């Protein structure tokens, strides 16, 4: 299964090109069979809560490749197991 720390690296690179606020990993839902995962991240600007961001990523070995941003988990319906809390 993907290492949750890999998502931090992935989100960090994504946020630099999309958002200026810091991105904090909240949860990971991974599908090891399809080698895909959905990340849920909270963006903060100082102490102010900014937004919830979802991104679908593809795992390639120990690295991640961003596929697309999704508005919510409802936009990517599937049976994701297991559920990781970070």
Swiss-Prot record:
Signal peptide: none annotated. Carries MUXF and MMXF, two complex N-linked glycans with alpha-1,3-fucose and beta-1,2-xylose residues in their structures. MMXF is added to Asn-62. Glycans are attached at residue 62. GO terms for molecular function: oxidoreductase activity. Keywords: Allergen, FAD, Flavoprotein, Glycoprotein, Oxidoreductase. Its cofactor is FAD. Belongs to the oxygen-dependent FAD-linked oxidoreductase family. This is Allergen Api g 5. It comes from Apium graveolens. The lineage of its organism: Eukaryota, Viridiplantae, Streptophyta, Embryophyta, Tracheophyta.
């Amino acid at each position: 299964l993907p290492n949750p720390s890999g998502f931090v690296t992935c989100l960090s690179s994504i946020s630099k090109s999309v958002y200026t606020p810091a991105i904090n990993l909240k949860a990971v839902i991974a599908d090891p069979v399809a080698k895909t995962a959905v990340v849920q991240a909270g963006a903060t600007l100082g102490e102010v809560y900014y937004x919830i961001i979802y991104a679908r990523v593809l795992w390639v070995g120990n690295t991640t490749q961003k596929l697309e941003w999704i508005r919510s988990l409802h936009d990517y319906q599937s049976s994701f197991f297991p559920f990781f809390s970070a």
